[in-house]
Amino acid sequence: MNNISFKLFITISIVLIIIRLFFISNTILIDDEAYYAMYAKHLDWGYIDHGPVVAFLIKIFSYPFLTSFNVRIGAVICSIILAISLFFFGKKYFNTETGISLSLLLSANLLFHTNSTILTPD
């Protein structure tokens, strides 16, 4: 693998992250996200239909202001962590090109892109 393809990989990844950030800053919360944001205001170890992880993520990233961007930024950060993890997994067990392919195939997938900007466990 040459340096140019790695720079292209980084550039494409950054562009996809910027698109996600633009998307979450220009859309309103869906009903479930508003429901989980209410959970974040009243944290508990469990709720009637879900565990506390989504509420904890929203609480962490929405301090001190509870906005739609802050509610969804946790989903974007988790998707970035997943893409980086896939890159290192592919690099460790196969080669660098496989790591790049895994990460880009995940990040560029339209269904993943849409679902990685909505913070719900469903």
Predicted regions: what is each one?
Residues 53, 85-86, 101:
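Hydrophobic/aromatic residues in alpha-helical transmembrane segments
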Residues 10, 69, 73-94, 108:
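Transmembrane-helix motifs of polytopic, lipid-linked glycan transferases
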Residues 111, 117-122:
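Short acidic/glycine- and proline-prone juxtamembrane loop motifs at membrane-interface regions
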Residues 13, 102-110, 114:
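Short helix- or helix-capping micro-motifs
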Residues 24-36, 46-57, 65-69:
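Extracytoplasmic catalytic/substrate-binding loops of multi-pass membrane glycan-assembly enzymes
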Residues 5, 67-69, 93-101:
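Membrane-helix interface segments
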Residues 12, 58, 71-79, 102, ...:
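Alpha-helical transmembrane segments of multi-pass integral membrane proteins
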Residues 2-29:
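Transmembrane signal-anchor helices characteristic of membrane glycosylation enzymes that use polyprenol
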